[in-house]
Amino acid sequence: LEAKEAAKKAIDRFACGLSSSRPQATTIEHVQLEKRLAKWFGFETCLTFTTGYQAMLGTIAALADKDTTLILDSYSHACILDGTFLAAGTPGRAPEVRFFNHNSAKSLERILKSRERKNALVLIEGVYSLDGDRAHLKEFVEICERYEAVIVIDDAHGTGTLGERGTGILEETGLRDRVPVCVSTFSKTFGGIG
C-alpha cells in the first residue's frame, strides 16, 4: 500500500514515463533511490538505469576499452553478450573478448593467464538464467584477485532470493567486499521498472 501511494505521488509530480533524459526530469528522486540502494546492497555508490539489461550494457561500455580483455561465461545472459559485442564493435576502443567454459574455474584461470590485454573484466551471473545454477563465486573471486582482474556480477536472479536480507549472492556467500561491481534489476524482485 505504501509503495502504491508513493507511486501515485511520483506520477502527480513527475508524470509517467521517460519523456526526457534523466538530468531534465527526475534526478532528485533517482539520487535518493541510488543512495538507499547502495546502503541496502552494501556498496559505496549505485547508479540506476531504466532496465537491468541497459545497466549491464552501460557497465560494460563504461569499463571496457582497448586495454581490456572481457572474459565471459559461455552461458552468459543476452545483456552480457550484447554489451560485450557493442563494446567490441567500438572503433579504437575495442576490447579483446574471450569465453570460458560454463562455471569452470580452471577454464577461467587458463584464459586469465593467457590474456593479451593489461586489464581484465570477468563477467558472470550469480544465478545463471540459462540453467539456474549458481556461479562458483568464491573460486572466481580468488582467481580474479590472483590475476588482478575485476569481476562484474549480474545478480538479477539472486536479488530478493538469496541472503538473509535478500540482497543476493554476495550476501549469501559473504563476498560483498571482494566484488566491486554488481548489476541487478527491479523487474524480477521489486515489481517495478522504468
Predicted regions and their residues:
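Short glycine/serine/threonine-rich phosphate/pyrophosphate-binding segments
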Residues: 48, 53-59, 79-80, 159-162, ...
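Active-site PLP attachment segment
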Residues: 171-194
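Conserved N-terminal alpha-helix of the aminotransferase class I/II PLP-enzyme fold
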Residues: 4-51
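Substrate-binding/gating loop at the entrance of the active-site cleft, primarily
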Residues: 51, 72-89
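Active-site phosphate-binding strand-loop segment of PLP-dependent enzymes
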Residues: 95-153
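Conserved PLP-anchoring active-site segment centered on the Schiff-base-forming lysine
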Residues: 60-78
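Short, small-residue-enriched loops and turns at beta-alpha junctions
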Residues: 23-27, 78, 105-106, 127-131, ...
